[in-house]
Amino acid sequence: MTEKQKLRMVLLLQNECNLAKAKEAYEFVIGSDAEDVPVATGTGGEHKCNVPDPRKDGVYLRYSDGHEEWFDGKNKKENVIGIAVHLGERHTCIAKFDVEDDDEGDKEFPLQENNNSDTEEDKKAFITSYFDAYNDLDGKKHTESLMRRGCKIPLAENQYIPSQGEWLLVLMFFKKVQEALEYACGEMLKDDWYWSSTESSSSSAWGVVVSYGSISYSIKTNTVRVRPCLSCEAI
């Protein structure tokens, strides 16, 4: 993690996972006043020094041919398959729609109906710490493990359930992600619970409440929405 990412993480934890308060604290610490930013002038015009390229971190549209474009509201809408988020070396890409059972029309699913098949190796992946959960980006690996142990969520090929760390990336850019989903004719995230693939025990896993950015454990047999991620193979 970069120093700025570490600062964001600390502020998020100190503000009890309240994204709005954490963002306000971050902006206060970093500073956003024009006089705080060194300005270099020359024949090329003004350039604000030490300002990161805004195209590195943020929200992108991913297309069916594999390329991604920085989302600016002027992109072409055809063939968009997902909304990608990049923050330093971290990145994820969510699909345009929640998982839906084509036969029953259900949009809420249990993560796992029983835990009888958990091995000691499976249990080593359980995460109970908020900080560790935020740093968990192994959604694809966790999903493969859940499927092996009986998860019945009807994911499409090359889809997986996002880890808690991947959800954090989405929530950090939530408003822009919602804007991109609407722009690309996708399904905006609902004010509801969504599963992550990060497990906390044999009987529970982490989830997010999109309406106010809260995260917590939930019993795996509870029926909850799923917004899948797209794996690299989907590109």
Report residues per predicted region.
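An exposed tryptophan-centered "aromatic clamp" motif
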Residues: 140, 144-160, 164-220
